[in-house]
Amino acid sequence: MASWAEPSEPAAQLLCGAPLLEGFEVLDGVDDAEEEDDLSGLPPLEDMGQPTVEEAEQPGALAREFLAATEPEPAPAPAPEEWLDILGNGLLRKKTLVPGPTGSSRPLKGQVVTVHLQMSLENGTRVQEEPELAFTLGDCDVIQALDLSVPLMHVGETAMVTADSKYCYGPQGSRSPYIPPHAALCLEVTLKTAEDGPDLEMLSGQERVALANRKRECGNAHYQRADFVLAANSYDLAIKAITSNAKVDMTCEEEEELLQLKVKCLNNLAASQLKLDHYRAALRSCSQVLEHQPDNIKALFRKGKVLAQQGEYSEAIPILRAALKLEPSNKTIHAELSKLVKKRAAQRSTETALYRKMLGNPSRLPAKCPGKGAWSIPWKWLFGATAVALGGVALSVVIAARN
């Protein structure tokens, strides 16, 4: 694999300093030779040393020696720009290699930026290069290292970013591009353009589909890396692109395509919310899917799981049975339903025992203790018997009155 390219000439000047007296060579010439002839009869200067025959024969040799002796000490080269610790933890740092033009601005959240990206491992092995990578700033379309560092750049700037794996591909790594697990990365980023994002209301049907699909694919990538917060954010952005008000007419086919895409995003959003234990939000997402597609197996299954996580076994079991009826061979639904039936039986047993305890365990009458008479009967039984007797008398009176 290729390693990092050398910095460009402007970057080298920024890091090492520009050379002094760039026009020095124009001092050589005929006039210098004439000056040398005029000085030939003078004794050598002790503090400068006598030139050799070869040096004296070169045109302008004494002039060059004189200028070298009288030339002021060169100014020290400016130190390279310090690294900026973006988050203050040393895990994400940025250094400007080539500054942006004077007056250039920084991009804002929500703008679409285009960058030239070169990505390498810490050992210098280049793993990816994207000459025209475009993404919406702040939408989590790319790794966090880019989303957090690009807002600190000016348009036209080139910067080096070093990032811990936490802000790149994490413990899972990546297949494409291939990134090993827990790999820190070096990014060379050039911010080329920054433009306002699209007006969702003015998007055509196909443009909405394309935008929503991009956000959904970003969510899928985050989900596969077990970054469920970012996955949920991407799915939510996809749904927003689909459901926002439209000022452009769409065909029936486009509306149907958007509806199918919305269902996919809601299902994936519910899966992410389940992973985050956000049960109420997951329940809302599943319910929205079932409003459009009452027989959607994924939504039925996830809704049943959400209710089960909340302890609502009586509601969860019929929903899972409905899902199993739609797909009888699904082993996952079979296993989940069997588990819930057992949990429901255990829950009922616990509830029965609790009710008996609250009512004084009526299934077993207390044994008579020696030395105790009728007063040993609990007061609640006496009160209950009295109430029943009074009720019977009242009922008899009513019947007699009617007759």
UniProtKB/Swiss-Prot annotation:
Intervals holding TPR repeats: 212-245, 263-296, 297-330
Topological type in the membrane: Single-pass membrane protein
Compositional bias segments (type: Acidic residues): 28-39
Cofactors required: Ca(2+)
Record-level GO BP terms: apoptotic process; BMP signaling pathway; camera-type eye development; cell fate specification; dorsal/ventral neural tube patterning; dorsal/ventral pattern formation; multicellular organism growth; negative regulation of apoptotic process
Region spans: Disordered: 26-54
GO MF terms held by the record: calmodulin binding; disordered domain specific binding; identical protein binding; peptidyl-prolyl cis-trans isomerase activity; protein folding chaperone
Crosslinked positions (Glycyl lysine isopeptide (Lys-Gly) (interchain with G-Cter in ubiquitin)): K240, K262, K264, K275, K298, K305, K325, K331, K339, K342, K343
Alphabetically ordered keywords of this record: Apoptosis, Calcium, Isomerase, Isopeptide bond, Membrane, Mitochondrion, Phosphoprotein, Repeat, Rotamase, TPR repeat, Transmembrane, Transmembrane helix, Ubl conjugation
EC number assigned by the record: 5.2.1.8
Keyword Zinc: no
TM helices/strands, residue ranges: 381-401
GO CC term, one of those recorded: endoplasmic reticulum membrane
PANTHER family: PEPTIDYL-PROLYL CIS-TRANS ISOMERASE FKBP8, PEPTIDYLPROLYL ISOMERASE
Miscellaneous comment as given in the Swiss-Prot or TrEMBL entry: Binds the immunosuppressant FK506 only in its calmodulin/calcium activated form.
Protein name, UniProt field: Peptidyl-prolyl cis-trans isomerase FKBP8
Organism: Rattus norvegicus (Rat)
Encoding gene (name): Fkbp8
